[in-house]
């Protein structure tokens, strides 16, 4: 029987008791993480100041986005190909199929529409990437009838809200529901269920910079009180969710390795969009050998850590955080082959892109796995180069990857493939897609 992989934290009272494993590094010369946030509550909401918004309006805005994002802008079961009215998780890719930006897309609330016949959308993205995404959108705009604008600070606010005591679920309503959000169409609030992990909560966009309860006082919709961005980040990492281009590396990360297929961020049934070819080919014919997973950073005994079954966040931990993209290796390995890359962390937890058959017990093929429960892994790094803006000192910590139960089930059950057609039908569909892509590429070369 597999151990539970539910997310776990250590409260302030429990942290005074004996720890299962050491998380304290005694060397003061090592670079330590910033003050770690408190453990996230079971219910609460956070102001996401690290996220920015772009508005896109105009008669061509829907078809324009349809050719750029991994999500489908049209309701696929509607004979008239009606426009989607729900917010959703999605991504922008480059022509090689690498992620440019992870994003959320929301239809602008009806109360804010200048014309009911003119579609309008809000794109939520990493705040540091707003300028880059605007440049990408303008490059593809050409003669499309639409307007792009980066929203000013305080114009609208992005929130994350959750209630962990409720029954975990992937979504509270169908992505193709006629309802755009859980809020009244007459309000100026946009939102959607966050489908990146079961029961992860909701995404909400409110006008202005006031507290969320100013706009949504109903306790049945919003529970708990406001917490820090750091507490939200801890909760997100415990669920194994990467966000923003400090973790989903721009023009390097692949959408399937970032679990976007599992997070309902990709519609494999839609037509052509930038970066589709590699994504479709990998989905239908390839094996995803690396995925982003939650990891535990530690310096103590592996046996005690193994019994936890899931990452345990300790707000009192004092560990040096490895730099982003630092390589992970087996301890005492004869050949120093990288087993993955560390992406980011808070305190004694983090996220890493892991080779599944090396760092976990997940078996992807019938071949013999390289994983051993006794094997430990480490991430080590050198000091930052002289003249660098960062002041990173050399360091090393052990790292343990965990596979959330929903991630394991998705992988072992064949993911979305299992939910659509049989293997033979999938192979036929894959060939059709590839033939279509090759034909379109041939036509483009003749033009």
Swiss-Prot record:
Residues 24-36 have a biased composition (Polar residues). Residues 421-434 have a biased composition (Basic and acidic residues). Its main location: mitochondrion. Pfam families: Beta-barrel_CAF17_C. GO terms for cellular component: mitochondrial matrix. Residues 24-44, 417-447 are annotated as: Disordered. InterPro entries: TrmE/GcvT_dom1, YgfZ/GcvT, YgfZ/GcvT_CS. GO terms for molecular function: transferase activity. The keyword Transcription does not apply. Residues 1-28 form a transit peptide. It is found in: Mitochondrion matrix. The keyword Mitochondrion applies. Keywords: Mitochondrion, Transit peptide. GO terms for biological process: iron-sulfur cluster assembly. Belongs to the GcvT family. CAF17/IBA57 subfamily. PANTHER family: TRANSFERASE CAF17, MITOCHONDRIAL-RELATED. This is Iron-sulfur cluster assembly factor IBA57 homolog, mitochondrial. It comes from Aspergillus oryzae (strain ATCC 42149 / RIB 40). The gene is caf17.
